[in-house]
Amino acid sequence: MPFKKINIAIDGPSGVGKSTIAKQIANKFNYLFINTGSLYRAIAFFCQKNQISITSERKMIKHLPPNFLSLDFEGNVWLQNQNVSNLLRNDLISKNAAIIAQYPQIRKIVTEILQNFQKNHKGIIMEGRDTTYNVMPDADLKIFLWADAETRAKRRLKQNTFLNLETDFQEILKAIEHRDYLDMTRKTNPLKKTVDSIFLDTTNFTRDQIVSQISKLVFRKIGQFSLEI
């Protein structure tokens, strides 16, 4: 029996596990997973590829062609006629995406794409900063994930070690704290928890435990009983 479709928004700081957890929830309930940050990464990738400076929002906007960025209903990100979903994960793109994401006009472009995409559709789970109050303000279920910076840095270090990436814990911690500062202090749509979001502190819980907690919230929302203990 298929699950009833609702829309879910998951917010929280960098490195808290939003993507991993949202993907597991999406797979469990057969929902479509969208990483909203991938659109900012795609713009950063486009600028890098076309040698467009990101130091000035006004100048950058001039070089972005109309309708150059889109999503499909498998959650893939497209730049014009190219699926770039698997090309967006490197340190430079991450760094540039954090800069680009502070620009009001860029955030407006991305938000419009995401809102048009979800219009009249259910069964979508979106994760990303400002998802709960700007991108999906009418989501049926809103989750705000949290973990202290040190815990997030340890998780990132473990992940990098698994991927055979040489990284220093202090460098990771410093980068996470800097990203938190940028996200919390930016003028346009800063990182914050909304009144109607459910706060889950993941610091002392495993990923599977958090997935289980969120699953129970989803079951409750869709009016079905969970068999999970």
UniProtKB/Swiss-Prot annotation:
Its main location: cytoplasm. The keyword DNA damage does not apply. ATP binds at G12, P13, S14, G15, V16, G17, K18, S19, T20. GO terms for cellular component: cytoplasm. The gene is cmk. It is found in: Cytoplasm. It catalyses: CMP + ATP = CDP + ADP; dCMP + ATP = dCDP + ADP. It is an enzyme of class 2 (transferase). GO terms for biological process: pyrimidine nucleotide metabolic process. This is Cytidylate kinase. Keywords: ATP-binding, Cytoplasm, Kinase, Nucleotide-binding, Transferase. Pfam families: Cytidylate_kin. It comes from the Bacteria. Belongs to the cytidylate kinase family. Type 1 subfamily. The keyword Kinase applies.
